[in-house]
From Swiss-Prot:
Keywords: Ribonucleoprotein, Ribosomal protein. It comes from Trichlorobacter lovleyi (strain ATCC BAA-1151 / DSM 17278 / SZ). InterPro entries: Ribosomal_bL35, Ribosomal_bL35-like, Ribosomal_bL35_CS, Ribosomal_bL35_sf. This is Large ribosomal subunit protein bL35. SUPFAM superfamilies: L35p-like. Residues 1-23 are annotated as: Disordered.
Length: 65
């Protein structure tokens, strides 16, 4: 049986942690930043985990990561 291809777009957006959770970056950080507060932009820099309902689908896209 052939290997499953990794979805390259998902590979650039998500990383698996040591415990198997999937990390993701926040949205709203690329442009139109002038009206956002420093605190909001600082908090958006922190990583977050994928919701539990999406975890299975994301893991199928990045099987070897």
């Amino acid at each position: 049986m052939p290997k499953i291809k990794t979805n390259r777009g998902a590979a650039k957006r998500f990383k698996k942690t040591g415990t198997g959770k999937v990390k993701r970056a926040h949205a709203f950080t690329s442009h139109i930043l002038t009206h956002k507060t420093s605190k909001r932009k600082r908090n958006l820099r922190q990583s977050n985990t994928v919701a539990a309902v999406d975890q299975k689908n994301i893991c199928a896209l990045i099987p070897y990561m």
